[in-house]
Amino acid sequence: MKKMLLIAVAMIFVAGIASAASIVDSKHDMRTHITNETNTEVCVYCHTPHQQGTSQYPLWNHTLSAAGSYGAYTSPTLNGTISPVPNSNDGSVTSLCMSCHDGTVAVNALFNPPNVGTLGSAYTAALDGTGKIVSAANLGTDLRNDHPVNLDYQSSITNGDSGLNSAASVSSLLIGGQVTCASCHQVHDPAIVPFLRVTNTGSTLCLTCHIK
């Protein structure tokens, strides 16, 4: 009986963890930022099962930014090749993230709204009166002061950067061999603020790639 009770408690504990790590009610649940929202869908602010607005994955539903070049971080010690961050319909992970995070497009600007008239128009302090991000999550349209993205990881090693772990050891974090926003951030899991893949306590996240 005692054993069964312990198992039940453990299951409740695990379920609690799973719930806490859900995108529902997280900062990526856009319903929490729109005060008169009557839409009940969570995923719709990024994804749609039909009539996607881009020609590539992942069934993207959010209007892409029309911003020009975002620029890229440069440094005398940077050996890798950085590709321009596109804002076209190519499905680039970084361009999808920036469609909200460059602060030029409202978070509820969708290609395929769930139901006409269900998206609210009053926003919380994280958004301005037009639904654009104004908090620290607004990275702006200049990425030259941010960690490099669209960086070819292997090219850094090939060109002599001995301060990086092997590309094979971090392959699960790379998309098309590149470092992107999603290399550090897990957009669907708010368990580790701010949506980090692993904790950065003791620089754990940084040391996943960097040898220091």
What are these regions (language model features)?
Residues L6, I12, G16-V44, T48-K212:
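C-type cytochrome heme-c attachment and multiheme electron-transfer modules
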